[in-house]
Regions:
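Residues within well-ordered alpha helices
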Residues: 40, 76, 90, 222-223, ...
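Active-site cores that bind ATP or allylic diphosphates and position pyrophosphate for catalysis
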Residues: 1-53, 58-65, 73
Length: 249
């Protein structure tokens, strides 16, 4: 250049030679550059790396990334609560002819990755698919695998049984703290529910300790018989009483 700085091509090739690069994977916009780079490698009497070019990601409608979607860097996804292994799963399989499934084993993911499975068409990035995959990944963790992380944010308040319940109702790991706060808290949510008849029936029909897997069904059946409520008319206000939430399990 006029300012004395070097163009991209020669420094790139020299750097690859110096670092003994054997395989180069880059975007399809570099296809024309690759032919030129191969000639540079040969002119410098260097081994020519193997090249592969991947198609560009598009949004869910097949359009180029907008500035909004362009902000979805790996760091931003991590900050938003996506598990590292979720991101790795998604990136290794998006655009391939394989179904994206929850796999926590990094060695398995690496061994099963094959560039031949990558389609030449532009893959569509879907935040909904990524979120669903993150949920599947979390559900695949047993308590022993994740207990240390749980204790860091929940102060040893979560045991194996509680994890088995909460992991079915979270999209992101940090949400477990919300459930611990609800379950362990003594906050009274009944004042937020206007149905006095339902509250009275719920209190009067509450089964005695100890509670088990059948308690919920037995209890809600009694409330239904006492109030005549059913479906969402029963479960939505009951959820509000128990958790303070309008949506959830």
């Amino acid at each position: 250049r006029e300012d004395g700085s070097l163009l991209y091509h020669l420094p790139s090739v020299i750097d690859d030679i110096d670092e003994k690069i054997t395989n180069i994977i880059r975007g399809e916009d570099h296809i024309s550059n690759t032919a030129f780079h191969i000639q540079l490698f040969k002119s410098l009497n260097a081994s020519v790396p193997k090249f592969a070019h991947h198609p560009f990601l598009t949004d869910n409608e097949g359009k180029g990334f907008s500035k909004r979607l362009g902000s979805l860097s790996i760091n931003r996804l991590q900050e938003s609560g996506y598990e590292n292994i979720t991101i790795l799963n998604y990136l290794l399989n998006i655009g391939s002819n394989k179904d994206i499934i929850a796999d926590k084993n990094i060695s398995s993911l690496i061994n099963n990755f094959d560039l031949k499975n990558i389609s030449s068409s532009n893959p569509k990035f879907s935040i909904d698919v990524l979120k669903s995959l993150n949920k599947d990944i979390l559900q695949s963790f047993n308590f022993d695998e994740i207990s240390d992380r749980i204790n860091l944010i929940c102060d040893d308040l979560v045991d194996k049984k509680l994890w088995q319940f909460t992991k079915m109702n979270i999209d992101f790991f940090v949400e477990i703290k919300n459930w611990v706060d609800i379950i362990k808290s003594e906050k009274n949510f009944m004042k937020d529910t206007m149905d006095a008849k339902l509250i009275k029936a719920a209190i009067e029909s509450l089964p005695e300790h100890p509670y088990n897997e059948d308690t919920w069904e037995v209890w809600t059946r009694k409330i239904k018989d006492l109030t005549g409520l059913k479906g969402k008319d029963l479960f939505m206000p009951l959820r509000k009483i128990l958790t303070g939430m309008n949506n959830g399990p």
